[in-house]
């Protein structure tokens, strides 16, 4: 699918682009699936993101890694300051987008998501590998951008401001409290709007929906460019 109509089309690449650039010296392709899925086949040259990298090693909670931990992980994957990173998964870009966000939060903006992920790669006739590639030698400098994060007190203040939208992207059962997902408390942030993340994805291709359709869906939920948007 063409991406020119997106505000930032450079955030996405298609399978043909990845195939043409996968051997470039500065390109690092990161498979964001679990070990078992990676072993069943992956893009040649791809490296596997560590399992549960998104969890704080001390508390086990889903916090962003501390700078030195994130640096160590990136260098272990061969991601350096000058790398062009391509992320992909089998899951409608859920985990690929999380790594995209984490890298951007740590100041690495040259990162793109393979639109359609593994399904798009196979549909394009892409080659499949089963071994593990040796990561490239790399130096990663974390530059954490706190503006991409919000603390609880700041979110509480945002609840009181008319120019803000708090967007709950979780499942229906998490939203209504019937599924705790292991959390001590259930429900949702007061005043939040609910739109599960996968509503922006094409269930047949695993690609992002067209830009005009995404805009329509977001607008119907009050998520518009004039608002400060907080997601969780």
Predicted regions: what they are:
Residues 2-7, 62-158, 178-179, 187, ...:
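Thiolate-centered catalytic microenvironments shared by cysteine-dependent enzyme domains
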């Amino acid at each position: 699918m063409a991406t020119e109509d997106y505000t930032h089309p450079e955030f996405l690449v298609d399978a043909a682009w990845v195939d043409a650039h996968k051997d470039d010296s500065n390109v690092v392709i990161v498979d964001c699936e679990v070990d078992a899925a990676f072993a069943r086949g992956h893009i040649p040259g791809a490296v596997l993101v560590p399992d549960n990298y998104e969890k704080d090693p001390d508390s086990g909670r889903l916090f962003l890694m501390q700078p030195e931990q994130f640096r160590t992980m990136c260098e272990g994957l061969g991601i350096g300051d000058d790398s062009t990173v391509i992320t992909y998964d089998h899951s409608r870009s859920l985990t690929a987008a999380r790594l995209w966000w984490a890298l951007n939060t740590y100041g690495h903006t040259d990162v793109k998501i393979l639109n359609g992920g593994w399904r798009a790669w196979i549909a394009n006739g892409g080659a499949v590998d089963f071994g593990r590639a040796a990561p490239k030698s790399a130096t990663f400098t974390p530059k954490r951008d706190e503006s991409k994060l919000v603390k609880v007190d700041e979110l509480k203040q945002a609840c009181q401001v008319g120019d803000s939208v708090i967007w709950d992207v979780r499942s229906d059962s998490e939203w209504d409290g019937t599924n705790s997902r292991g959390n001590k408390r259930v429900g949702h942030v007061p005043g939040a709007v609910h739109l599960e993340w996968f509503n922006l994805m094409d269930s047949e291709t695993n690609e992002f929906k067209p830009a005009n359709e995404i805009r329509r869906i977001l607008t119907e939920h009050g998520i518009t460019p004039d608002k400060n948007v907080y997601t969780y």
